[in-house]
């Protein structure tokens, strides 16, 4: 398992510092997480390289591809892969404990249609994701960066919407979910302004939680406390 960070440079050779949507709060791996990475990486892990993936080589078939950015500890992603064996899932997460937990859960569940990466998703999209190949891109509960001075760190922004659009297949879907109303409004504003997308909601801007997105323990607790969750789906239309 390797980790590589790309740097951009000015004409003078100075490094351009990128604004990232995440902070590496790297906790210790448990023995189980570390063991899962050691045991499962060769079959379920994908190292970052500056080369476009061939999904048939990655999964051994040409089934539809669902890609999730920031899967946390991976419980929901593994559950989705279990319930949809004829769909291929790729999860990207920057925190190694989450990657280890996801691999451990996937091994226990016996899923074979799931692969994971431990890298910055933006760099993965720029270098490795084939054009017109992703059926659904999932972004569930990303860091809201709720302080106004940190809004520039939010992953959903005009540049991101532009970058992912050519990776979605014809009528591919970008599915977002957040429990911060301000971030939901921001997502709608960004995506409404982004060319080549249409909101699939039929009543207002948001949709009910789709059956394919599992209800997390965190989300269920939020519901009990009266907290809202906003699901948003935009379809590529150009």
UniProtKB/Swiss-Prot annotation:
Any one Pfam family match given in the protein's UniProt record, by short name: Methyltransf_4
Q: Which reaction does it catalyse?
A: guanosine(46) in tRNA + S-adenosyl-L-methionine = N(7)-methylguanosine(46) in tRNA + S-adenosyl-L-homocysteine
| InterPro entries noted in UniProt | SAM-dependent_MTases_sf (IPR029063), tRNA_(Gua-N-7)_MeTrfase_Trmb (IPR003358), tRNA_methyltr_TrmB_bact (IPR055361)
Residues that hold substrate according to the record? 147, 179, 216-219
Primary enzyme class: transferase
Give the Enzyme Commission number.
2.1.1.33
Quote the cellular component terms of the Gene Ontology held in the record: tRNA methyltransferase complex
Give binding positions for S-adenosyl-L-methionine. 68, 93, 120, 143
Presence of keyword Methyltransferase: yes
Q: Which Gene3D superfamilies match?
A: Vaccinia Virus protein VP39
Keyword annotations from UniProtKB, A to Z: Methyltransferase, S-adenosyl-L-methionine, Transferase, tRNA processing
Keyword Lyase assigned to the entry: answer is: no
Pathway note: tRNA modification; N(7)-methylguanine-tRNA biosynthesis
GO terms (molecular function) for this protein are: tRNA (guanine(46)-N7)-methyltransferase activity
Active site residues per record = 143
What role does it play?
Catalyzes the formation of N(7)-methylguanine at position 46 (m7G46) in tRNA.
Which family is it part of?
Answer: Belongs to the class I-like SAM-binding methyltransferase superfamily. TrmB family.
NCBIfam families for this protein = tRNA (guanosine(46)-N7)-methyltransferase TrmB (TIGR00091)
Please identify the protein, giving its name as recorded: tRNA (guanine-N(7)-)-methyltransferase
Provenance organism? Aliivibrio salmonicida (strain LFI1238)
């Amino acid at each position: 398992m390797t980790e590589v960070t790309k740097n951009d440079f000015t004409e003078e050779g100075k490094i351009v510092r990128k604004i990232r949507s995440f902070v590496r709060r790297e906790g210790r791996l448990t023995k189980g997480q570390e063991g899962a990475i050691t045991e499962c990486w060769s079959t379920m892990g994908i190292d970052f390289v500056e080369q476009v993936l061939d999904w048939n080589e990655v999964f051994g078939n040409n089934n539809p591809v669902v890609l999730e950015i920031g899967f946390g500890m991976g419980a929901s992603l593994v559950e989705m892969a279990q319930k949809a064996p004829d769909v291929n899932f790729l999860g990207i997460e920057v925190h190694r404990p989450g990657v280890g937990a996801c691999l451990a859960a996937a091994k226990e569940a016996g899923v074979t249609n799931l692969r994971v990466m431990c890298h910055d998703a933006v760099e993965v999209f720029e270098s490795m994701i084939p054009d017109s190949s992703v059926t659904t891109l999932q972004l569930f509960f990303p860091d809201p960066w709720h302080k106004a001075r940190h809004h520039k760190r939010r992953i959903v922004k005009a540049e991101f919407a532009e970058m992912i659009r050519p990776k979605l297949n014809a009528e591919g879907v970008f599915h977002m979910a957040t429990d911060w109303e301000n971030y939901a409004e921001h997502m709608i504003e960004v995506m409404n302004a982004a060319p080549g997308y249409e909101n699939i909601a039929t009543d207002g801007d948001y949709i009910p939680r789709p059956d394919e997105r599992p209800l997390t323990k965190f989300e269920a607790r939020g519901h009990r406390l009266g907290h809202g969750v906003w699901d948003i789906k935009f379809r590529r239309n150009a």
